[in-house]
From Swiss-Prot:
Binding locations of Mg(2+): 718, 722, 886
A matching Pfam family: GATase_5
Gene source species: Photobacterium profundum (strain SS9)
Protein name: Phosphoribosylformylglycinamidine synthase
Catalytic activity: N(2)-formyl-N(1)-(5-phospho-beta-D-ribosyl)glycinamide + L-glutamine + ATP + H2O = 2-formamido-N(1)-(5-O-phospho-beta-D-ribosyl)acetamidine + L-glutamate + ADP + phosphate + H(+)
NCBIfam families linked: FGAM_synt (TIGR01735), PRK05297.1 (NF003672)
Membrane found in the keyword field: no
Single biological process term from Gene Ontology: 'de novo' IMP biosynthetic process
Catalytic residues, chain numbering: 1162, 1287, 1289
Ranges for domain Glutamine amidotransferase type-1: 1069-1322
Function field: Phosphoribosylformylglycinamidine synthase involved in the purines biosynthetic pathway. Catalyzes the ATP-dependent conversion of formylglycinamide ribonucleotide (FGAR) and glutamine to yield formylglycinamidine ribonucleotide (FGAM) and glutamate.
Amino acid sequence: MEILRGSPALSEFRVNKLLERCRELDLPVSGIYAEFMHFADVSAPLNSDEQSKLASLLTYGPTIAEHEPTGTMLLVTPRPGTISPWSSKSTDIAQNCALGNVKRLERGTAYYVEVTADLTNAQLTDLKALIHDRMMEVVFTDVDSAAALFTQAEPAPVQSVDILVGGRKALEDANLKLGLALAEDEIDYLVENFTMLGRNPNDIELMMFAQANSEHCRHKIFNADWTIDGVEQEKSLFKMIKNTYEKNHEHVLSAYKDNAAVMEGSEVGRFFPNPESRQYNYHQEAAHILMKVETHNHPTAISPWPGASTGSGGEIRDEGATGLGGKPKAGLVGFTVSNLRVPGFEQPWETDFGKPGRIVNALEIMLEGPLGGAAFNNEFGRPNLLGYFRTYEEKVTSHNGEEIRGYHKPIMIAGGMGNIRADHVQKKEIPVGAKLIVLGGPAMNIGLGGGAASSMASGQSAEDLDFASVQRENPEMERRCQEVIDRCWQMGDANPIAFIHDVGAGGISNALPELVDDGERGGKFQLRNVPNDEPGMSPLEIWCNESQERYVMAVAPENLAVFEAICKRERAPFAVVGEATEERHLTLEDEHFDNTPIDMPMDILLGKAPKMHRDAKTLKVEGQAIDRSGIELEAATQRVLRLPAVAEKTFLITIGDRSVTGLVARDQMVGPWQVPVANCAVTAASYDTYHGEAMSMGERTPVALLDFGASARLAVGEAITNIASADIGDMKRINLSANWMSPAGHPGEDAGLYEAVKAVGEELCPALGLTIPVGKDSMSMKTKWEQDGEQKEVTSPLSLVITAFGRVEDVRKTVTPQLRTDKGESSLILIDLGCGQNRLGATALAQVYKQLGDKPADVDNPELLKGFFYAVQALVRDEKVLAYHDRGDGGLYVTLAEMAFAGHTGVEVDINTSESDACDDVLAMLFNEELGAVLQVRTEDLDTVKSVLAEHGLTACSHVIGTVVDEDVVRIWNGNDRVLEQSRTDLRTVWAETTYQMQAMRDNPAGALQEFEAKKDNSDPGLSAQLTFDINEDVAAPFIAAPFITKAPKTGASVVNAPAINLGAKPQMAILREQGVNSHVEMAAAFDRAGFEATDVHMSDILSGNVQLEGFNGLVACGGFSYGDVLGAGEGWAKSVLFNNIARDQFEAFFKRNDTFSLGVCNGCQMMSNLSELIPGSDLWPRFVRNESERFEARFSLVEVQKSDSLFFNEMAGSRMPIAVSHGEGRVEVRNGEHLNAIEQSGTVALRYLDNFGNVTQNYPANPNGSPNGITGLTTMDGRVTIMMPHPERVFRTVANSWHPDDWNENSPWMRMFRNARVNLG
């Protein structure tokens, strides 16, 4: 084993945060220094050249001052017997760098701890808990112990459970020991069936049965028979959901039978490479819409980052594994937790009711969980465009007496939408003899029993089992798998996939039987064919673990070679683990032990498990009206604005990429001031169309404490009032996902669940013409524990989260909450679907005063809601609405405030909508949460708007309440009485406090403070655009039609590599990607539009010699996470070029040709900056390292094009315009001041960050990474090679910009870059 010291692992502020945690735990720790330590398992001693190469490979990341470590060393490494994602990716890089003697690399972190007193054993345990993840890592106290990383344990054998002798008791004991969560009737069922088979079950068979039949997988409660108050009910919960489909399935193509639902999309030109030539082009066809929303509540409570991360990963796989392969497109996340209680920022309504030790608190969930969800989406390459965040934890008088209701078991929602080909919506048959394949990462001993564990109330399983049920993530692996699926579906009728499922709860023990069962087959499997990174695992652990990033599929034998070639090119691991059989029987053979751990008929596993029956009693609560005595209006506004459900959520948004794909038409951030208040998310269906897709969310969970049905109806209603801001057209074009969370079995809750499902499934949705083709249930939303000898429990309210998906006619017509002051005189209209009832039960106002209230808002008249939707749609389509915001948490007051924040303007309104001189209840008028919306319309259009509202029966509930004023004010009148006059800037600051506090705790506190202070500046002019060229001029047009001499790229022996002169021939553009790159398609689309022939080139094509760069005119290295950024962002990619002779020679020759050009964006920028020794004229280029915030930053940033020789920026110097930024490692790092001066004097700086005043800035977040002098793009001395961190390819279309001036047409100013490249070639 070779040992190599690495760079320091923690920045100064990270060390300070760790020391702060030590102080909180009363640990006598005075200092901490940490550095990476690398371990290499070699097959032979490395020679000096190999040692030098390896040392260079393992030198990466930002330069942090090193010092000789002192103090006690604690070495954190991956658990021996496991192989970490870092290890597999860095080993891949080493192999690609011709380091064949390196069998495996692994990394640890050495912490050197200085103490003021000896640590006790308990203190040492506490310290270790701060620095390692006990599921995945261990702590050693000496370096030599790390040799255990490369030792392999002997496989453990299968264990049988002796029911033939021990009877039922033996199975009961196994049930507890293995955490199977089997019900009493299931135990009887298994004893009976295995006795009939005349043999004992093996532990692997029992675990497989438990997973496949868990509540998580089988949805027993939703499929149960029901008796309520002694009356047998006609329908199960699921049948009532399916009723929506029976009543209306006009545009639904697949429901209830696959991993995601499918609805009709638009006919567009889908843009992807030809499977044969690998040249990108448009394919005119239907882009149908995938819909899925998952929950990952239990793992997120135990370990928030991996819990939320794998929740997002699992939902992405669901979309990819729909039909014969789908394409995930855009994501959403949501969190409901108990009170945050931010230290030093505790709020008056936040009481501490305690929690069990095995779960983390709400604050920890919200500091870590959103990062996990965002990180997976970011690295996979899916924009996260939508979400919600609610806190609730209160002692209330409910139908069960006084009890604590809250979310100690959190809700973690992960969802999204994608696209699928029309011919791939339905799965095929599995032919007998089909090869059964596992695609993706290796088996690891994690996530055991996840399906069963999540089906129990928190506290019913042992703590070790709870922790064992959490999975760990590797999104870069999932990206590789998705690339394989993409290559398959892009083959159309030749798609080799016959059947596909994702691997989720229960691992392959659930996925493979489900695969063959759905295909009406049996299966014969080989255990030792399963890719396995932990050889010491038992058969149960190999078969049942929930290692992530895996898919199972059936491929006909004649298509196997094609599939194998695709996997090899994408470097996606796969294995044939079995064959489909005619007989519906399941066999698993283990050649290591020469036995058969599983041998059972399919119908015992999946066919005849007992059906559940639920007997429920209705319990209702009579709430008390809100006590107004302690509520003062001004103070109430401050409290409500600080409630997390209302408060600004920037800390949850800027950590997530919102521009990848180049198809995002509406993200959360609105207007020139980028305020996170969008009503819904919108994407374009492709790059050649304005058709698209929209999604919105709705949830009002505290209302269920007063009225189960009202809570469910409001969730649907809110999703509709949100999505109404997009151009949908027909309401039947909207489909819903319903995610149900319930503390099943809690008094009154079962009947309440039935009432809520009936309210939407049998009543509201059929009345509106809406379908619920997809959803999920989580039926164990309760946490129990013992504290100080007292039994405690926190029970969640019944929680329905609705997500609405809709096809969009024209994405340009989406209306945001941004109030406009540049459109002439305007009026504000309130549409009040509560029709003046102004009910305050379970509102934000009630919550911040620790009350519940009596009557909540409701959907009393479905026809009124339908009329509202169609009226707003008519106004949106005719462009009669300047701004739109639905009324939700915080009521009318918050709606108006958020619209003012987005428009950076003032509002003046009169809330008296009655016939009398004044409204008789100001508090209720301002803070009720009845459904509705506020519209800003031109005063000249007011009569037209009123006419449309009247046509849809809305006259009685529509009121002109005020206007926009060009002042820093929110001024509210009640008739002639001015009841509130507040500074909008002050309110904006209050609204931002929660996000600031969370950012300061989680990220670099200095940057968080800078961002918070910037929000206090009322003089901030917001984003703007000033161009030095004509945005509408297509400078490339004359060249696209002219003759062009091109040399066809060498992409294999079949291509004739001869010069040809073709009229209108296109220059050849290599769209270069490495494993983990995710921004290549939008890059190809931009160059294609500029007149290039864009070709998909994978690094594996170059390393294999299948593609030669000499045939290309241009080369672009694209953005993403090559190798998961394990050896520094872009550095592993660069070193696989520098240290591989085949690749090095090709790149060096290409860069030296004077008839080529190159571009590196984001990850490609980082990669090319590390190739400077091969690129003439790039000697001064800096490195790009971790952002100063130490956080992934997704911003819409203002930049200025500098005067340089870059061919891309010809005639663009001096132009200022916003651009998408998405990176975690974009900070320019120079060697010293002299290096920086040399860069500045060389004239190679091409782009700089500006603040909104037009000044070059280093201030956060206008400069999102802290680069000196705002530098974010550079070029070579001759201008042929340009590198930049921002993403012009994601915003080349105007509609893809988060904000843009109204006079921009189809192409944004960034299109000029790509056209300049075409002009340069002549």
